[in-house]
């Protein structure tokens, strides 16, 4: 055997041992013997660099330093899941599905919901080429070098696999590894980590991949995304992923009814604490991929999947004090400061009290013993008071009447739960919060400028609103704490680059109350520019798709405010994009203007997205459900019987794929 063959044999042996241990949980070699073989391979590779292979087991130890993580678009969007908290919720979900599919017999895949950091890993020709964090679902941070250090993730695949696909999973930190890491920190006098989930998530963003390699992270895979995949069901997809070398949890189960879903939930609600890692629920997916395609997606989540959350854990502790926070819109949020208590794997020191009504409803008082619950919330909540332990001298909590930051008298609008500080342009947290919102990734996405720096700029009198950002010069900010020449230049350059951000994002960045990302996109698309929007009447706004009276009034109030008018004029002067830039499609026409289409089924010449784009490029609108307002239904193979029946009943023309293409190619 020559040197190259020896190296290749060692690599194959070590890869197989890694797979046996980290994926199959079956050690087939002692740690000592494994290390001896790994050292032998390292020595041979060092002596013969001409045989270097980036997928060698020796490259698992990391060593690459990443100073800035690139943000890259997901090829296939990473959706969130809708949550359910009762079996009744699941029955309602199944009923909604059946109304679309036509009361067919359904199978479901039940999988445990692991509490970690979501990841999307891309493979091409059997090799790992890229790994992205979830990010906002549309784009994520590239963490490929760090992901390659996790031994349960294959660098090369086994068997017969698609040429290109993405696989999604959860990066988790098992309890044993987490406890070992914390024990090592305690021994050297360092602060231990708070919980496995945050530690796993933070590990992905460490700059030195060698540090990531030291952490006992694992990856549990749960879905494959791609075109022309070699399976027709979710469960077959999991089995295929196992054959390719991925660690797919064995707990996943294929069931034939909602009752079997309930049985799965009941079993794991009792036995989940025996698992070596955190799980907070069950994910239920329609098993048939064809049915998944038929059901489609909402703006945020797949209609064919839902998460069932296990009931929250509770703990009791003492309420030490109540503090009040001011948000960017002036909303006051009371927060309970608690004696630290262990809850669901974390140390809890604070809990949300929501508003004055909640404090009054629970009759919460300082020094009370309270019951704290942690569900899906970032901050836990108080659910009850232990009245038997209440001190005799306790006093009823009086909700504050003035802003804790600027001392302005608070207001409470009719029908709203929150109190507000009306000092919109003079209250420091509101000013800072608005600027922080303006610079955020989904808004102006200003690189080199973070929330702490915004607070520092305000504290030093350099900014009082987001228009002031465009007046900043490097020499103005060099004297700030932790601000070097390069940092100052990056900040100013980031602000300058934000002038390229499109109108819909600018509109969201302005921070108009009730105008989120989706609403901002609709308004930008409808009005085309800021001047037309600012002059719109209440009735004009309400007529825009999905814009109700509450949003419309908020938009009008924003543009009627003199301070806002001044800020917008300044932003115009600085060159901010206040007009929609129409992207010209040379093949676009107006032949479908005023027509609404519903697309259903599976197509051979178009993907569903391509078909929808063809409709929109030619002036048409794509609806999600069939109604009297639908003009055409484009029906692919295996169109749902319920949709077919409804379209027929309403006498809506049903076009085959070929008929649609003919219609598309007709001259106007």
Swiss-Prot record:
BP GO annotations: DNA repair; DNA replication
Record keywords, A-Z: DNA damage, DNA repair, DNA replication, Ligase, Magnesium, Manganese, Metal-binding, NAD, Zinc
A GO cellular-component term linked to this record: cytosol
The keyword Manganese appears for this protein: yes
Documented EC number(s): 6.5.1.2
InterPro entries: BRCT_dom, BRCT_dom_sf, DisA/LigA_HHH, DNA_ligase, DNA_ligase_CS, DNAligase_adenylation, DNAligase_N, NA-bd_OB-fold
Domain of life: Bacteria
Residues holding Zn(2+): 403, 406, 421, 427
BRCT domain location: 587-668
Catalytic site: 113
Database matches in SMART domains: BRCT, LIGANc
Cofactor or coenzyme needed: Mg(2+); Mn(2+)
Pfam families hit by this protein: BRCT (PF00533), DNA_ligase_aden (PF01653), DNA_ligase_OB (PF03120), DNA_ligase_ZBD (PF03119), HHH_2 (PF12826), Nlig-Ia (PF22745)
Described purpose of this protein according to its UniProt entry: DNA ligase that catalyzes the formation of phosphodiester linkages between 5'-phosphoryl and 3'-hydroxyl groups in double-stranded DNA using NAD as a coenzyme and as the energy source for the reaction. It is essential for DNA replication and repair of damaged DNA.
Sequence similarity: Belongs to the NAD-dependent DNA ligase family. LigA subfamily.
Protein's UniProt name: DNA ligase
Species of origin: Flavobacterium johnsoniae (strain ATCC 17061 / DSM 2064 / JCM 8514 / BCRC 14874 / CCUG 350202 / NBRC 14942 / NCIMB 11054 / UW101)
